[in-house]
């Protein structure tokens, strides 16, 4: 029995790699070598330097707001939540979470891959009977 030949797809579209590449030295590429030496934790000889408390002197000439303020809002919300009683109307909950037969307002059959000729829309009918997607326009 003869084997079927193997076919391989050969693409005809050439893709250009993005620039800059992650394989490049980005610090050197963008001219940040001197800054990296100044603020680096380890000097060129491998000795550890004292950690600087602030980089503010290096970024003051950049536009924008350069000072980060401590914000403990989320921490306060988590540690001391405001607990207040909220009245719950049980009848309202039953109304909003109830499911009734009929067409869903704003339903788009194309989202679920249903055929375009499925009858959906505002047609007067008995709302107690759900509309079947198999009913077609004539």
From Swiss-Prot:
Annotated keywords: Activator, Nucleus, Transcription, Transcription regulation
GO annotation (BP), single: transcription initiation at RNA polymerase II promoter
Covalent S-S links between cysteines: none
Localisation per UniProt entry: Nucleus
UniProt cross-references to Pfam families, sorted A to Z: Rox3 (PF08633)
UniProt-listed InterPro entries: Mediator_Med19_fun
GO function terms (MF aspect): transcription coactivator activity; transcription coregulator activity
GO cellular component: core mediator complex; mediator complex; nucleus
Job of this protein: Component of the Mediator complex, a coactivator involved in the regulated transcription of nearly all RNA polymerase II-dependent genes. Mediator functions as a bridge to convey information from gene-specific regulatory proteins to the basal RNA polymerase II transcription machinery. Mediator is recruited to promoters by direct interactions with regulatory proteins and serves as a scaffold for the assembly of a functional preinitiation complex with RNA polymerase II and the general transcription factors.
Family: Belongs to the Mediator complex subunit 19 family.
Subunit field text: Component of the Mediator complex.
Protein name: Mediator of RNA polymerase II transcription subunit 19
């Amino acid at each position: 029995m003869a084997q079927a030949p193997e076919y391989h797809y050969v693409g005809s579209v050439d893709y250009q790699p993005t620039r800059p590449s992650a394989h490049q030295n980005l610090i050197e590429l963008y001219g940040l070598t001197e800054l990296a030496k100044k603020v680096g934790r380890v000097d060129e000889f491998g000795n550890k330097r004292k950690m600087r408390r602030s980089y503010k002197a290096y970024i003051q000439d950049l536009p924008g707001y350069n000072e980060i303020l401590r914000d403990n809002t989320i921490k306060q919300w988590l540690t001391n939540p405001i607990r207040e009683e909220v009245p719950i109307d049980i009848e309202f909950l039953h109304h909003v979470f109830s499911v009734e037969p009929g067409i869903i307002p704003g339903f788009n059959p194309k989202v679920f891959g249903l055929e375009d000729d499925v009858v959906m829309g505002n047609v007067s009918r008995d709302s107690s009977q759900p509309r079947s997607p198999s009913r077609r326009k004539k």
